[in-house]
């Protein structure tokens, strides 16, 4: 009977019905909406920091903006990228009910991020000499270096915050993350006001407020995991008859040799994930730099700043879709349901195209009004409005390609996304942007046509990799190898957790 049930699981949803599609839609958006809200709150926190920097003066705003850009490129993008390497491991471990691997992977990622924070901190400490070497204004550089120095503790908070987010999302725990983020961001505004306007700490006050806000998020998330008993429930078998005590598992999981011994395999997943995210993230910063070489650099850089803020806001939905579909795909593969994983991927891609189309619509219809929200300076307003439809078209490609990258991470293939981003953004987008903006003298819009070409190449490549090059049954076998065959014996026989796949596929793994 057990063989029959697991065989049915393996082939379930092979030909999905409409009710199954609707069920998947509900399950996906039950995760996506809280994560989108959380992303929007994080976006609001960043805007609040910039607003308080602006209250201090133009020098402080310029220095803070320079430092924020530098920390994003050298620090936060790396932290987020490495932490995303947890997605296939944790989601597939959760799907296969390998609670030990789930928790141990979280510990390993914290160690990896702690190691990564050391060279990053050296870069942040030496921001001043680096910027002066690159020819930046000394006054702006001094302000940026001051902000960066006081933001250093945020590296430590992110070594816990980023892995915790992936760890919880992989287990479909999304609403608590939203509420914890809301509580932390609610403190962000009064904290900035108190440090900047009352205590007159200036730029350091803005940096410290951001650090404290992230620290509050970490404390709340750790508190939730502890109070909810999630960790104890997971490692004790979650009511499935596991006889392992929490003490025994924690004792084994804390083994230094065991912890360090698994860093290599996790790094092999984390590094490509990091490259895939960073390559795209960094390209937007390159656009800002290229804007500084146009005929009217001040106008171009100002317009670029507004447009990147706009794309960051629009990115909150596809980023949530990517993270949640990664968890859904990983969960189903880990549970031995490859066709349900395929359904989750297809439903998420369909949603991504709808979101992209909505972005095209509003950027065309509301382009003048949106530009007017940021500036009353007519030349800047006209420039931003003229490029808004191009940005909308970019999102038509960005939404499905970001979601597709999430699917690839869920299947444990982040290297494919990294290769696609490298080729699309740097071997397609950059030459097109430079050629149109500088050689053909199209100017500012040429840079964004470069982004459009990059997104077009990226979405075609990602969709091909997901829709045409994914062997879902094979990915289920790989998920079994990743989770079941790596499970340590903790009070039960390893073989009891192996998925009962067909003999040929199981034989290939064993």
UniProtKB/Swiss-Prot annotation:
GO cellular component: Golgi apparatus; peroxisomal membrane; trans-Golgi network
GO biological process, one term: xenobiotic detoxification by transmembrane export across the plasma membrane
Keyword Transcription assigned: no
GO molecular function, one term: xenobiotic transmembrane transporter activity
InterPro entries, A to Z: MATE_euk (IPR045069), MATE_fam (IPR002528)
Membrane topology: Multi-pass membrane protein
Tissue: Expressed in the vascular tissue of all organs.
Cell compartment(s), UniProt: Peroxisome membrane
Keywords in alphabetical order: Membrane, Peroxisome, Transmembrane, Transmembrane helix, Transport
CDD domains the UniProt entry points to: MATE_eukaryotic
UniProt function note: May function as a multidrug and toxin extrusion transporter in the export of IAA-conjugates from the cytoplasm into peroxisomes.
Family the entry assigns: Belongs to the multi antimicrobial extrusion (MATE) (TC 2.A.66.1) family.
NCBIfam families linked to this entry: matE
Protein name: Protein DETOXIFICATION 54
Source species: Arabidopsis thaliana (Mouse-ear cress)
Gene coding for it: DTX54
């Amino acid at each position: 009977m057990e063989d029959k049930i697991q065989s049915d699981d393996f082939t379930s949803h092979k030909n999905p019905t409409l009710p199954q599609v609707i069920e998947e839609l509900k399950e996906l958006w039950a995760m996506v909406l809280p994560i989108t809200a959380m992303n929007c709150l994080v976006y609001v926190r960043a805007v609040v920091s910039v607003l308080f920097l602006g209250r201090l003066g133009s020098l402080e705003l310029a220095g803070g903006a320079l430092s924020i850009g530098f920390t994003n490129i050298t620090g936060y993008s790396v932290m987020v990228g490495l932490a995303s390497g947890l997605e296939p491991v944790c989601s597939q471990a959760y799907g296969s009910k390998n609670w030990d691997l789930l928790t141990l992977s979280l510990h390993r990622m914290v160690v990896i991020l702690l190691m990564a924070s050391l060279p990053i901190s050296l870069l942040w400490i030496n921001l001043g000499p680096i910027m002066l070497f690159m020819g930046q204004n000394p006054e702006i550089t001094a302000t940026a270096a001051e902000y960066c120095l006081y933001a250093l503790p945020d590296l430590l908070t992110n070594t816990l915050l980023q892995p915790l987010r992936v760890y919880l999302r992989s287990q479909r725990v999304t609403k608590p993350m939203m509420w914890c983020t809301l509580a932390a961001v609610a403190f962000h505004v009064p904290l900035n006001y108190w440090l900047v306007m009352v205590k007159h700490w200036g730029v350091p006050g803005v940096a410290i407020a951001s650090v404290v806000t992230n620290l509050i998020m970490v404390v709340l998330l750790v508190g939730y995991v502890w109070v909810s008993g999630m960790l104890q429930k997971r490692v004790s078998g979650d009511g499935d008859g596991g006889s392992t005590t929490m003490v025994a598992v924690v004792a084994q999981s804390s083994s230094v040799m065991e912890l360090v011994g698994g860093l290599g395999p996790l790094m092999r997943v984390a590094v490509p994930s990091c490259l895939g995210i960073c390559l795209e993230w960094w390209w937007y910063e390159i656009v800002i730099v290229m804007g500084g070489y146009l005929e009217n650099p001040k106008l171009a850089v100002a317009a670029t700043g507004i447009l990147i803020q706009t794309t960051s806001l629009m990115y909150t939905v596809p980023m949530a879709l990517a993270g949640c579909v990664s968890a859904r795909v990983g969960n189903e593969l880990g549970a031995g349901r490859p066709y349900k994983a395929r359904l989750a991927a297809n439903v998420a891609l369909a949603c991504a195209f709808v979101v992209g189309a909505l972005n095209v619509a509003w950027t065309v219809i509301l382009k003048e009004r949106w530009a007017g929200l940021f500036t009353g300076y007519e030349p800047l307003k006209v420039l931003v409005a003229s490029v808004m439809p191009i940005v909308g078209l970019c999102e038509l490609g960005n939404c499905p390609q970001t979601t597709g990258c999430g699917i690839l991470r869920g299947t444990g293939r982040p290297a494919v996304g990294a290769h696609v981003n490298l080729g699309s953004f740097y071997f397609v987008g950059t030459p097109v942007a430079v050629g149109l903006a500088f050689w053909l003298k199209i100017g500012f819009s040429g840079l964004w046509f470069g982004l459009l070409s990059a997104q077009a190449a990226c979405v075609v490549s990602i969709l091909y990799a997901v829709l045409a090059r994914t062997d879902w049954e094979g990915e289920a076998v790989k998920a079994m190898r990743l989770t079941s065959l790596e499970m340590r014996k903790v009070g039960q026989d390893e073989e009891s957790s192996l998925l009962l796949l067909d003999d040929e596929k199981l034989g290939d793994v064993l």
